[in-house]
Regions:
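Terminal domain-initiation and capping elements
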Residues: 1-113
């Protein structure tokens, strides 16, 4: 089992923006890692405290993946953290060297990626 990480910065604190950003992040992570949805054990999203108008996990259900267990939680409030940030952790049943996905302004979170 492995964990595949990623992050994206939401353009604004609106339901549409949060859900669209979450869909982009999840789909990009699927594509970059050639993931089979049936091997996804669970997905955890975190959001910074300024994003309070939608649950990112709803994006997965909106994409039709209603059998995936998904959870939303609030990220720690750390000084200097990127605002409007949605992070993801996909727990996946396989072993390989994953491609973690950091998009937009979130690329600065992991300059090694």
């Amino acid at each position: 089992m492995i964990g595949i990480r990623g992050a994206i910065a939401s353009v604004e604190n609106s339901e549409d923006s949060i859900l669209e950003s979450s869909k982009i992040l999840f789909n990009t992570l699927l594509e970059k890692n050639n993931l089979s949805v049936t091997k996804i054990v669970s997905v955890i999203f975190t959001v910074t405290k300024d994003l309070n108008t939608a649950f990112p996990a709803k994006a997965i259900r909106d994409l039709g993946y209603d059998k995936i267990s998904a959870l939303d939680t609030l990220a720690p409030d750390v000084d200097g953290d990127l605002l409007g940030c949605i992070r993801i952790l996909v727990i996946y049943e396989d072993q390989f060297d994953p491609n973690h996905v950091y998009l937009g302004e979130a690329k600065d979170l992991r300059p090694d990626r």
